[in-house]
């Protein structure tokens, strides 16, 4: 048995195009000024498709809603946590910061002006005092009534001290030898050199000799009693003992030891108010007038000691 395909018969009926009906409903409800609700509803119905064999019908409905909110700041009335800036200008923070920075700069400027004024005044005061001291030194007592100097009262004691210092310098300069301004060593015996021998102790010996000569001049002014010349006799005895003990040369004393000894003797005489031993030694002149053969009989250490003490001239 052969099975054949069965094809149903369909009868088509001609008809017109369907009509489309759309219904739109919109409702707006406004309850408060702070919110608004908009709702739209649309309903659409599709035409139904009918046929002799099949019959179908369909429908669709859609709805949408949108909520829009408006922001409003809270009221500042009676609220302690919110700054009421309605009565304040704009940029209050910037104005405050600028005022603080300006105050700092103004304080620095005032400090600089005050310090410069004080330093200038101090400098002028010192310079005027020094100028007046140099100008009126020695005769400020006679010219104080002619000029009004505000520093005379405060510096009277210093002026008197300067006068005494100048007088003492004048007295000491009377006994000083003339020195060449072009010689940095200020040695008056360099031009009178009689040999080519150069000694490292020459400057020390010449200085000690000149110092002893000035000291002898000062002592000769105030000492007139011949009974005080006992020191010369002691020096002569020591010189004789040195000549006898040529076989036992003594150790040469350094300039520092001699200087300390002189200073100690001066302190002793100042404490006891005595001038014994400060008389110039007469044997120094006798050694200079002695013949040169005496140097050959002396030991080198003794000769160096005499040079350091100013008794010998190279």
Curated annotation (Swiss-Prot):
Major subcellular site: membrane
Organism: Saccharomyces cerevisiae (strain RM11-1a)
Name used for this protein in its record: Vacuolar membrane protein SCRG_03194
Topology with respect to the bilayer: Single-pass membrane protein
UniProt keyword terms in alphabetical order: Membrane, Phosphoprotein, Transmembrane, Transmembrane helix, Vacuole
Family stated for the protein in its record: Belongs to the PRM5 family.
Region ranges (Disordered): 32-60, 240-309
Gene Ontology CC terms: cellular bud neck; fungal-type vacuole; vacuolar membrane
Residues the record lists as Phosphoserine modifications: 148, 254, 274
Biased composition (Basic and acidic residues): 254-269
InterPro entries (alphabetical): PRM
UniProt keyword annotation of Membrane present: yes
Organism classification: Eukaryota, Fungi, Dikarya, Ascomycota, Saccharomycotina
